[in-house]
Amino acid sequence: MGFLSKLFGKNNATQSKTGGMEDYMTLVRVYFQAVLATRLGINNLAMLPDLRTYKQTFRVPTLNNKLGPGEKASVRKTMKNIYNVDDNFFDEIDASIKKNCKKMQDIQPYLYQFQGFTQDLMMLVGNLMKFKLRVPGFFKKAIYTMTEKTVNDIYDKNSFSDPGVIKAVMSVRQYNQRLGFSRKWTIDFVYQVVSLAKKEPKPAEEAESK
């Protein structure tokens, strides 16, 4: 959609390259930061840059002088409206943060783990689904089924031959042992990113439009 890109002050050239996938990932980060603020009593917005931008852009009021609860409810509603995200997706993030972030010092290691998890996961998906990703975006059920199989392979299959793939697979499994996301959460997350990526302009299309 690009609406966050516009609201966050990015120029038109940047907007055309961002679109729904970047908006989605931004909102996921906002939700993580809102949960962290709620659980750990963080009131310094400078520590939570994505949450600060979201709060200021959408003028989300602070509830009961506590940063987090109002912003958490707002971004949850936004993601439901735009991406049809279900409650379980948010509940699993809440549970993961509750399990892993007991004190302020836990925040950075946790966020690094999540970043590593998503980067390795999406690299693997791109590698393992590279031919399947040519399926047109309107075949939603087929894309979901292929995503489900790929994620199941990442967690279950032990016969990969490429050393880089093997290393990334082991990394994803180790990250998720700590993060604690269910397989369905991972499948839904990957499916959303893949679906949004398919809607974005290809480099050739961007060149033609210039």
Predicted regions and their residues:
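General "foldedness" signal
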Residues: T38-G41, N81, R183
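Alpha-helical oligomerization segments
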Residues: Q174-P203
